[in-house]
């Protein structure tokens, strides 16, 4: 079994990278998010590998961090989730974002993944909710903020800022996480901050 590959990026396909390791080109399937973050052809990189062996083929899946590989495995424990859907989920949500989305019951964030409808998103959240904290620490402030937004008890500037980021195309969990980080950075000033300032700070968090 192959657990890690280190080599030179040869070329890219729609959902894979060919990694040249000592003259041998390995086809490694990756999430869209991982492919976007790999270097250009001719540069070195390394990937954690999940190897799937079947009677007629051996397929390699690559990940930049071990947490992504662990989520890839965990997602497939849910009925209806195969490798393609698991990579789709990891294409729209980083491991920490996925853990938070599941822990907070944000089915909408999970449903943004290709191949994941509302019913499958609900099943993923329900079956993995108790396991999510073991894969990434969940920020209590983010959970509280998410609950306040859902209950419509969040301060208006906070709700407006999150809504603005969602309207810009970000997932609800991404917007909430960015605003939660911005509020934490503001400290005592968080109680008087305006929505436009939160939006600017939230976009800065999302750009990191």
Swiss-Prot record:
Compartments where located: Cytoplasm
GO biological process, one term: DNA recombination
A Pfam family matched in the record: RuvA_N
Keyword list, A-Z: Cytoplasm, DNA damage, DNA recombination, DNA repair, DNA-binding
Superkingdom in the source lineage: Bacteria
Start and end residues of each stretch annotated as Domain I: 1-64
Residues covered by region (Domain II): 65-143
GO cellular component: cytoplasm; Holliday junction helicase complex; Holliday junction resolvase complex
UniProt cross-references to SUPFAM superfamilies, sorted A to Z: DNA helicase RuvA subunit, C-terminal domain (SSF46929), Nucleic acid-binding proteins (SSF50249), RuvA domain 2-like (SSF47781)
Region span, Flexible linker: 144-152
Stretches the record annotates as Domain III: 153-208
GO molecular function list: ATP binding; four-way junction DNA binding; four-way junction helicase activity
InterPro entries: DNA_helicase_Holl-junc_RuvA_I, NA-bd_OB-fold, RuvA, RuvA_2-like, RuvA_C, RuvA_C_sf
Domain notes: Has three domains with a flexible linker between the domains II and III and assumes an 'L' shape. Domain III is highly mobile and contacts RuvB.
Role description: The RuvA-RuvB-RuvC complex processes Holliday junction (HJ) DNA during genetic recombination and DNA repair, while the RuvA-RuvB complex plays an important role in the rescue of blocked DNA replication forks via replication fork reversal (RFR). RuvA specifically binds to HJ cruciform DNA, conferring on it an open structure. The RuvB hexamer acts as an ATP-dependent pump, pulling dsDNA into and through the RuvAB complex. HJ branch migration allows RuvC to scan DNA until it finds its consensus sequence, where it cleaves and resolves the cruciform DNA.
HAMAP family, alphabetized: DNA_HJ_migration_RuvA (MF_00031)
Assembly description: Homotetramer. Forms an RuvA(8)-RuvB(12)-Holliday junction (HJ) complex. HJ DNA is sandwiched between 2 RuvA tetramers; dsDNA enters through RuvA and exits via RuvB. An RuvB hexamer assembles on each DNA strand where it exits the tetramer. Each RuvB hexamer is contacted by two RuvA subunits (via domain III) on 2 adjacent RuvB subunits; this complex drives branch migration. In the full resolvosome a probable DNA-RuvA(4)-RuvB(12)-RuvC(2) complex forms which resolves the HJ.
Record-stated family: Belongs to the RuvA family.
Official protein name in the record: Holliday junction branch migration complex subunit RuvA
């Amino acid at each position: 079994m192959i657990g890690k590959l280190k080599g030179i990026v040869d070329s890219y396909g729609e959902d894979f990278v060919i990694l040249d390791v000592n003259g041998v080109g390995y086809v490694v399937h990756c999430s869209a998010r991982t492919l976007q973050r790999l270097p250009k052809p001719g540069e070195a990189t390394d990937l954690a590998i999940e190897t799937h062996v079947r009677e007629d083929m051996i397929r390699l899946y690559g990940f930049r961090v071990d947490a992504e590989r662990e989520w890839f495995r965990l997602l497939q424990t849910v009925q209806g989730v195969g490798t393609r859907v698991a990579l789709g989920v990891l294409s729209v949500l980083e491991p920490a974002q996925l853990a938070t989305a599941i822990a907070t019951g944000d089915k909408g964030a999970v449903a943004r993944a290709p191949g994941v409808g509302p019913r499958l998103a609900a099943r993923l959240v329900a079956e993995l909710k108790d396991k999510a904290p073991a894969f990434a620490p969940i920020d209590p402030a983010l959970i509280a903020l998410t609950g306040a937004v859902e209950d419509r008890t969040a301060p208006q500037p906070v709700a407006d800022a999150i809504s603005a980021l969602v309207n810009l195309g970000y997932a609800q969990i991404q917007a909430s996480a960015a605003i939660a980080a911005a509020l934490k950075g503001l400290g005592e000033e968080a109680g008087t901050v305006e929505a436009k300032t939160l939006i600017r700070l939230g976009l800065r968090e999302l750009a990191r």
